[in-house]
Amino acid sequence: MNEDQFPKAYDPKSSETGVYSFWERSGMFVANASSEKPAYSIVMPPPNVTGILHMGHALVNTLQDTLIRYKRMQGFEVCWVPGTDHAGIATQTVVERHLKASLGKQRTDFSREEFLKHVWDWKEKSQNVILSQLRQLGCSCDWSRQRFTMDPGANRAVKKAFKILFDKGVIYRGYYLVNWDPILQTALADDEVEYEERDGWLYYIRYQVVNSEEFITVATTRPETLLGDTAIAVSPEDLRYSHLIGAKVVVPFVNREIPIIGDFSVDASFGTGAVKITPAHDKDDYKTGMNHQLPMINILTPTGEINENGGIFTGLSREVARENIITSLEALGLFVKKEAYSSRVGVSYRSGAIIEPYLSKQWFVSVDSFRDSLRGFVNSEEIRIFPPEFVRNYLTWVNNLKDWCISRQLWWGHRIPVWHNKHDENVICFDGEGGPEEVMRDPESWYQDPDVLDTWFSSGLWPLTCFGWPDENSLDLKKFYPTAVLVTGHDILFFWVTRMVLMCSAMVDTEPFSDVFLHGLIFGKSYREYDEKGEWFYVSGERKRDYDKGKALPKNVVAKWEKLSKSKGNVIDPIEMIEAYGADAVRLTLCSCANRGEQIDLDYHLFEEYKNFINKLWNGARFIFGHISELTSRDLEEGVNQDLLGLEDFYILDRFNELLDLIDGHYNCYSFDKIASLAYDFFKNDLCSTYLEIIKPTLFGKQDSDQQRATKRKLLATLLINILGVLHPIVPYITETLFQKLKATLGTVENGKGDSVTGHAVSMLRSEACMVAEYPKPIHVAFPQGLRESFGIAERLVYTIRNIRGEMQLDPREPLQAFVISSEKKELVDVCIPIMCALGGVKTVEQLAEAPKDSIFSLGVVEGIQVGVILPPEHLAKERVRLEKEKTRLEKSIDSVSKLLASEDFRTRANPSLVQAKKDSLRNSQRELQSILDKLASL
């Protein structure tokens, strides 16, 4: 074969760019909203424009592209909409850091418009990199429909949705205790707060009762908030304090008199049984304050410093204020003690700041009216969640859903479309262009709300905005909405998935997608090195790479699977992996790992393993090309003579049909790992290691007729075309490259359609590309009765020969001489002999009536068929040992099955077919044991 036409090694770099350009140039990614084909649509979870793609992006987009390519080949009008997310807090934070590092300036050094120009510039650069990387991965998105969560269409949709909810009274504005990030100076939703267990202190502080010499002691983790105390609470059932309920105490430093109240929410066993109530800075205290109509005093500035309500502590940070207050309490004799105490602390998922419960006026979405529909979509299976274990998580979250804080004190994002009157409480919600008519007439009296919407508000509308809503006449909306499936990580089931269901169903009264597949989160291997003091640090750089490649770990280094993190040194860059192993190897690795668990352990050796498979695919195809190069498409159009098909041919066709059936089932439930494994095993084991090895003597002219050889070649071409189709959704680059080589080799398809064996391959060859070819279908032939059983016997005969070779330590390169004894299955043995020779490394196999008396041989029995391997004289002792082992195994098996069959409970309750199978198994084992005993006796 010409090296230029078909190089010995596959080079991803030399083909991937050209193949992708061919697809894109040919318009194969573009969806047609006017098509009569059934629709299949996906909207890409938009990557944040904060940087570049990470391995999680590579995973989710590989899985989506696999589905899109599969459905495209099945004849659906597929539409995969790509896009990026403005990611309000995240992007603003990144840009602020960039400006600080590059220009030495803060956000507040710019006007709002100037700062936003910097953010838009950042967005353009980041988005271009992200989209380029998606192309490298092989994503077959419809780039003509590319969207951004702050593009004009998205902005129209966001304003429209806000006004719809505002007019319904679902959106409201009010004072509420929010999660405040003092670094980013914005409110966060409850699910944007991460909780960490942290060690701290429990402080005991005394408050003097007014007009009394008595004191009441409380325990608190946050003594600085006493400046905002408005009550002391005790349990009404706590006899220690019942006489004090209704009395008042004095708050130190601010000299405010506050009541002692009785409240059943107080845990009398915690601390002293008395707790301070600071409604403006604690969520539980807020509820108590509302129930008792207590004042709510905010003591903090937006930056986390003590405000004017803090008296002498005004201007201090929370941390410094705490220290000064404790010192001052000690001086006044009001500090009792402190105890070590561990508590859950809320931390901002973006800035890492300790979250401050903060009384603030914010915009909210009331969720009560949505709760039933959110449950109903999933309970009725209008939305199916995969894996189903997450249904419970979803429903639990919906049941505990609280009003959603949607305002953010940021500059980057969708500005809230509400105008406030400067002179009264009037507000106008407006969803049109420009501003409301009242504002245009008297602009000096109005101002637009300065806050922006939570990123998840616009992301919640993503499936709608991608297809043109709120334009109800949009062809895309009519054709492609609702979408088929949402593929995303399980970690944003609450952040995003539920909010999409809420927002989209509120706008158009239907679910945004039919299915949700929640993949696991990627974990990488990190290495902790411990020093003599027991302290540890993460290993990085060359040493880590050596460990990843299998270098033995020292005793003081421990490997651990952890979420990918730069600080842990276990980040795996998908683009680096593509450069090193090729996009197909990366995609296959990710698919093979995408099980239905919550964690995906991603190891470097997997990329190496699947790169080897890509090379195996190339080399296997190259071998086949060497034997079909003289074929033309016309040969395939003529079909094959099924009378010339052998057992091995029927076997491989049956295995292929079974593969299609299994893979289709796994696509339906998003078992990507099983799809990858099945396709991998079929090509590597069934096609290459089994079928090709069996037919090599025919291909090389060592056995069978010219007509049989021609039939095998047609079948090989047919199988290769079809398996390329099966593999294409996962490994599109190499399959497209090989498909184009097949088209060039076999030539233009004429008018013939082929037969039931070659017909679909002929149909695929008519396609411009593998990507748009029809997905393979089962190959229909008259399969012989008992095919699987017959080939199974052939495989077991081969296994027996290989087992004898191994146990006798015979040279694996030395062809063996074997014989077979079977009075009942001579025809089957005749069919099995070529398979035994090809796969068992046997030179000759004779059918005998009895074992040769003048030879030393090792004997095995398969389904009553005795198979023997002639041995050199020196192997007599080894054969006796082998037979004794086999005798022991069979005796144990016979004893176990006999006991089972002796059980009346088993015989009466078990399926009759299972009982019969056990009887047959017992009979075969007894026959095999007798053969072993006879052989031992002869030795």
From Swiss-Prot:
This protein's GO CC annotations: cytosol
Keywords for the protein's UniProt record, in alphabetical order: Aminoacyl-tRNA synthetase, ATP-binding, Coiled coil, Cytoplasm, Ligase, Nucleotide-binding, Protein biosynthesis
Cytoplasm recorded as keyword: yes
Motif ('HIGH' region): 47-57
Enzyme class: ligase
InterPro entries in the record: aa-tRNA-synth_I_CS, aa-tRNA-synth_Ia, Anticodon_Ia_Val, M/V/L/I-tRNA-synth_anticd-bd, Rossmann-like_a/b/a_fold, tRNA-bd_arm, tRNAsynth_Ia_anticodon-bd, Val-tRNA_synth_C_sf
Gene3D superfamilies, per the entry: HUPs, Isoleucyl-tRNA Synthetase, Domain 1, Valyl-tRNA synthetase, C-terminal domain, Valyl/Leucyl/Isoleucyl-tRNA synthetase, editing domain
Domain of life: Bacteria
Domain notes: ValRS has two distinct active sites: one for aminoacylation and one for editing. The misactivated threonine is translocated from the active site to the editing site. The C-terminal coiled-coil domain is crucial for aminoacylation activity.
Function: Catalyzes the attachment of valine to tRNA(Val). As ValRS can inadvertently accommodate and process structurally similar amino acids such as threonine, to avoid such errors, it has a 'posttransfer' editing activity that hydrolyzes mischarged Thr-tRNA(Val) in a tRNA-dependent manner.
PANTHER family according to UniProt: VALINE--TRNA LIGASE, CHLOROPLASTIC_MITOCHONDRIAL 2, VALYL-TRNA SYNTHETASES
Name under which the protein is recorded: Valine--tRNA ligase
Organism, scientific name: Chlamydia trachomatis serovar D (strain ATCC VR-885 / DSM 19411 / UW-3/Cx)
